[in-house]
Amino acid sequence: MNIKFSPPDITQAEIDEVVDALRSGWITTGPKTKEFERQIAAYCHTPKAVCLNSATAGLELVLRILGVQKGDEVITSAYTYTASASVIEHVGAKIVLCDTGEDGYEMDYDKMASLINEKTKVIIPVDIAGKICDYDKIYRIVEKKKSLFKPSNDLQEKFGRVILLADAAHSFGAVRHGKMSGEWADFTSFSFHAVKNLTTAEGGAVVFKNIDGVDPDELYREFMLWSLHGQSKDALSKMKIGAWEYDIKMCGQKCNMTDIMASIGLAQLKRYDKMLARRREIINRYDEAFQGLIIPVEHYGDDFASSGHLYLARIKGIDSETDRNAVIDKMAGCGIATNVHYKPLPMHTAYKSLGFDIKDYPVSYAKYANEISLPLHTLLTDEEVDYIIECFIKAVGEVTKNERPD
């Protein structure tokens, strides 16, 4: 067999939607993008959604709209992909990395609390593998620390505390205590990249909660300005007969979503619940088969359900990169693509150059050293899942010299 790690699930429905966009004569930001925004907002139970070309763009635009700048600090996880932190550098603020907690892949919340000071403006929690972070705990911490918060503009003043921006690149469709991903943090950024549960090839979206004293329509327009060069009209409005006149309000960015991208998303969203259900089936089969072999992510419980984006397995009996990589090699020999999520940021050249040292993040390193991500996607057949299970158990047994490590 040849099993890919995370191929996009594209059906005739997606193809038909894209063809419809191509034939419409309007292929950049237009009616399909606006409809996709409406459907995302409805799905997430939020007043607005802003479609962009990536989750990274979403994170950065939120920081810019909040006025985060040089002299400010933003806290995020050391155990994440670079996008969670690089956007902080982009706006000129200081990156503050927090080690992982012993349980799961979220930040160590006690350490996170200790990192908050008068310069802290935003915290970016990361929903690793599709599981929503413990926002009850996070909100308690920022409320307790609100006396330290020093707003530098009117929008920050509206919050009166450190602002929460969810890196929810993995968690679109996840639920916690009856609330959707997108309903928890003040702002939430989703990814629709090709490897994500719901894809638009490239793409992302920002949603936000109602903020006291802030008109959601005005906030939406602020995102529109930032996403299209600060232009007062989008392309669709500007192209109406006789309506060419526009203004550049500020020097914005260029990160809008196109109707071709939105077309894929509209088709995916129609069948997304079934896609989530299939992911849950595969996760349940993995969990049952690997009892005693790994430390898994707890994706489902009485009052929460992740989006089932990644199957992260920490292998018992392995505590080194060398042995973990040996398992990866054996899986490759079986024709199975695997991955590692994540190499902690302090191990990368860019973050070393900023002064970070992995020795200061021992829990993140320990989780990384024995973690392997198995294929988890909606194109997997039951036969392929059985084969992955068989090969993984065998590979781990050969490396650990123990078929079922305790």
Report residues per predicted region:
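Phosphate-binding glycine-rich loop
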Residues: 26-73, 87-89, 97, 146-150
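PLP-dependent aminotransferase-like
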Residues: 64-168, 175
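PLP-dependent aminotransferase class I/II
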Residues: 34-38, 46-47, 122-126, 131, ...
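N-terminal "arm"/small-domain region of PLP-dependent enzymes with the aminotransferase-like
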Residues: 1-26, 31, 247-249, 375
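Active-site PLP attachment segment
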Residues: 170, 183-233, 259
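A short alpha/beta connector and helix-capping loop motif
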Residues: 106-112, 178-188, 387, 392-394
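Conserved active-site segment immediately N-terminal to the catalytic lysine
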Residues: 152-199, 244-248
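Hydrophobic/aromatic ligand-binding patch that stacks against planar heteroaromatic rings
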Residues: 86-88, 180, 260
